[in-house]
Amino acid sequence: MTIETYTGPMFCEKTGRMIREIMVKEHGGWVQGEDFEVFNHATDTRYGDGVISTHDGDQVPSYMAKDSFDLLGKIAEWDGSCWVLREEYADLKTIFVDEAEFFDMDLIGVVDYIDQMLGVDVYLAGLDTDFRGKPFPGPMPGLLAIADRVHKYKAGCKSEEKCGEGATRTQRIVNGVPAGYHD
């Protein structure tokens, strides 16, 4: 099975690339809720509840999971000795997880279990670093380590100079001004 990640700074189209992959699956006849499922962290309500969304407004319905085991419990159930796919997800092939950086550290083990033991491919999108360029606190560093494929993207530089180069970091803005390293 496969664990695949889309990572990079904000505005590098991580979610957009994942939505395009979902559209390919749907075009191939896959059905959400049977062949694949989409998850987002419950705290990400920027574009409404129950969706993953690009900054341009492209959206896909999603299950809003409050933590890693909520995500696992949506597709699997404990049979007394191990997690098994729920009957309604017997044909599940793939899950998509947006904003993976917001989940708890258990996501690393949950994703590995879903991939290795349940035989389900996992696609994840999330920030790999903070505005300082340091690893984003949470599960992303561990998820990148266990991923079979890591796609790291750059955003378009939006500095006042509009340099046109690829941006490798997310710029934190405080009161309309770019934050310093210690802000």
Identify the residue ranges that each predicted region occupies.
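Conserved P-loop
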Residues: 1-84, 130-142, 155, 180
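Short acidic/histidine-rich motifs immediately flanking catalytic phosphotransfer sites
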Residues: 89-94
